[in-house]
C-alpha cells in the first residue's frame, strides 16, 4: 500500500552524483588462527525444464566443507537478466531436447571474486510442471484451538495488542460507513489517519480492525472475549444496516438495482474524482447496487474502469484495496466466531450493551452474509462491465473502459489487496452452487495477466513492481487453485515464492525499498543507497526500507503454500525467520507502536508509530500480526500432526490436548499429549521440523530414546502413526548455531553521512550474523568504516553466549560476541542497531582473479538501462499519451541517461585501454541510477523547490502561529516526507503550497 511513513526509494540528487576520488580502505579485524575450512563439494543441480519456461533453480544448496561440516548456502544464478529469461522461456529458441548450463555462485565465498562457482544442468522437456492436487494436504489448526502460554515476548506482544484493540473507539471505525450511507453520525468519532475525511482509502482501517478483533477473540482470555465480542457484534450489525440501504427494488427492471446498473458507460466516462464529486457520490447510495459495502462511494471502484490514476486529490487511491480489507475482516469474523462456541449471557441487573446478543454462530452467519452480498456485487460489476484484452498497444487496450488487463496493472490505483483470496474463500464457505461458482469466477477476475503470465513461466517480472500490491494477488491466485484446479495458479505462486527467496529477501525475511522491488540480487545496493532529505535538502542515509505489510503478506502466502506441500520444510523455515525477526520485532514491547518501513542495515532504528489500524496500511496489518503468532504452529490432516514451529503452546486436536513446553525462542521443546478419549489413547503420526539452521547437536527423543542417528536440516522427521497416551513425551533438542545470511551483491558504495550519498568502498561481501533463527544486531557499530571484519572460516571467532535472563519482556535473551562487539536479536532492539557487516571469510589463498578484462556485468547493466530508455522513448513518441504519465520520472531518468552515456564510453574502450576497476565503477554507478528511479506519476525531491523554502520560512520566521498555519505546516511536513520517501504526488505538493500560502496570507504575511 502507499507509504505514509519514512522510507525512501534511494533517489539521489544530481548534484550529489559525484564519487570520492579514493575508496575507503578499512582496517579489518584479523580472524582466529587455525586450519582454514573451504568448500569441498556442493550438491549437483540438474533440472528438467518444461518447454516454454525458465528453469526452476534452487536458491540454496547443500554444501560440504573440507572439515566435514555441512550447511545450506545461498546461491546466485547468472541467468537473471530479463532478456535471458525471456529467451529461455521461448519454445523456439529452447525447444524440447535442448540441454544447456546455467552458471551460478555460492555467495559470501572468496574462491573467486564472484563466489564459489557452481552450475546447473538444464534439459528442456515436453509437458508441464508437476503440481499437487488442488486441495490442501494439511491445514493449520484453527487459531482458537492453539493458545500461546507462559510469559515471553510472544505473550507480551499479544497482550499489548489486545489491550490496544480494547482501547480503540468502535464508533470511529463506523463513522465513515454511516457518513457514506446517509445515517446519523452524532455520537460517532470522526475517523483519522488513512480513513480521515481527506483521504480516499476510507474503510481499510476498519477492515483490519475487524480481522484483528476476530484474531484477538480467538487468542484472548474469557474476560477479554466478552469485551471483544461486544465490539464484533456491534460492528457487524451496523455494517449490515448500511448494506441494506442498497437493497433497492427497481420496478422498471423488475429486479433489485445491481452493480452493473451503476454509472452506464456514457455517464462513467464523464465522472470526476475530485472531492466535490466525492461528496455528491455519497448521496447516491441507493444506486450503488445490491450489496455494496464500503466506506467510500461506489463511484471509486467504477472509476478504475476508466484507468484513473492514483491521485488522492483529483482521482482515486486504491478502491478495491479497501473493499478487500472489509471482506477479509468479515470473513475472519465468520471463521473465528464459527469456531468458538458460546453465547453472550447478560447477568441479571447488568445494563444492556449495544447489539442484539446473538450467539456466536449467528454473528458468524451475519458476517458471512454481508461478505457474500458484497462479493456478489463484485461479481456482478466485473462480470457485466469488464473484460480482458491483451493485444494491441496501451492506447488500444484502454480505448474502451473496463479492460482488466490494464486496470490491475496500474500503480497503486490498481492495487486490489487480496480480493481474489477473499472471494475464493467465500466460494468455499457458501453452500449455494450458483453463488459458489460466481464467487470463484469473481476471484479470477482479479487475475493480472501482465504480471501473472511471465511469473507462471518463471520469468522474473517481479522486478521494479510495487511489492505489497502484488504479493496478495499471488496469495489470491493460489487460493483460487482450490476451486478451479488450474495448475497455472499453483505454478504462479510456487515460482513467485522461490524467486522472492533467492533474489529479493533480506535477512529478516522482509523485502523491498520504497515499497518497490528493485533489480534481482541487488538488496545490498538498494539498502546502502537509500537516502532521505531534510527541509534544507541535505541528504542522509535512510535504513527504513522493508514494508511490514510485505512481511505480513509473505507469511500468509508461505502458510498457504505449506498447506499444499507440508513436507517441504523450506516454507516453515522462512515463516519462522520472518515471524521471529521482522514481525515480532515490528511492535515496541513496552507501548503500542508498530513499524511501517522496517529498519535494515547500518545504524538503523525502527520507526515505531502507526498507533491505530487506520493510521497506515502497516498500522492495519500491525494490529493483526501480534494476535495470531500461533496460526502456523501446527498443521494437520486426518492422520498426521506436523509440528512446524517450536513455541510454548497448548492445542486441541483429535480428542487430545497437545502441550508444547519450551521457552521462546527455544533450543529445546518437550511435547506431551493428554487424550480425553474413553480409552485414554489417540492415534496419529507426528512429523517434526528440523530447521535449516540445526546443523549441530539436533536430536529428537521419544520417551527418552533418539529416533534417528542423523537429521537433515530443512526437513521433517516422522514418528509413524501410534497410539499416544499421557505418558508419552517427545523431546526436541535443537542448539542454535551460528551462520551468515549473505547479501547477494557485494558492497562497493554506500550513503555514509550528511550529503555523502555515494561513498565508494572496496568491493566486499556483506552479511548478517545469525544465531539459530535469529537475526543478530549490534548497537555498538554506527558507521561502515567500523564494520569491516575478517571472519574465521569455521566461525571460531564468534562466541555464542547462550540465553541470559529477562530481557524486559520476560523472554530469555540470546547474545553473541564478535570482534569485541556484543550482538542481540533484532526483534529485541528498540534503539539504533546494525544488522549487516562487511565480512571477509578467510580462505586458503587469494580469490582467483578474473582472467583479463571482464565487461559482462557492465554489458548486462547497460542492457537494463537501454530497456528503460526504449520504454521512455516509446511513450514520448505517442501523439496521445496513454497512460498520461511517463514510465519514469524526469530527474531520475536524466540521471540514468548521464550514467548510461558514461557507461557506454567505458564499454567502448579497448580492453587494453581500460582497467577492471574502471569497468566495475561504471557498472556500479549505472546500477545505482537504475535502482533509484521512480515511476513517472510520482514526484521527486526536485519538485519540492517551491514548497521547501515556504515551509522552512513559516517554521523559523513567523512567531505566534495561528492554528491554521500550524496545521498547514504539519500537512507540508507530511508531504515532504511522502515525496522524499518516494511516495508523494504532484497534487499533494500543490495542495501543501496553497494551504501554506493561504494561512500566511490570512496572517498578513
What are these regions (language model features)?
Residues 132-222, 260-284, 298-343, 347-358, ...:
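Aromatic (Trp/Tyr) and acidic
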Residues 493, 572-581, 586, 592-666, ...:
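C-terminal beta-rich recognition modules with glycine/proline-rich loops and embedded aromatic residues
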Residues 344-350, 369-472, 479-483:
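Hydrophobic, small-residue-rich alpha-helical packing segments that form membrane-like cores
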Residues 695-720, 740-747:
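Solvent-exposed beta-strand/loop surfaces of large extracellular or lumenal domains
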Residues 56, 681, 690-696:
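Short proline/glycine-enriched turn/loop motifs at strand-loop junctions of beta-rich domains
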Residues 225-309, 504-516:
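Helix-terminus loop motifs that line ligand-binding clefts
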Residues 25-127, 849-1005:
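Beta-rich interaction/scaffold domains
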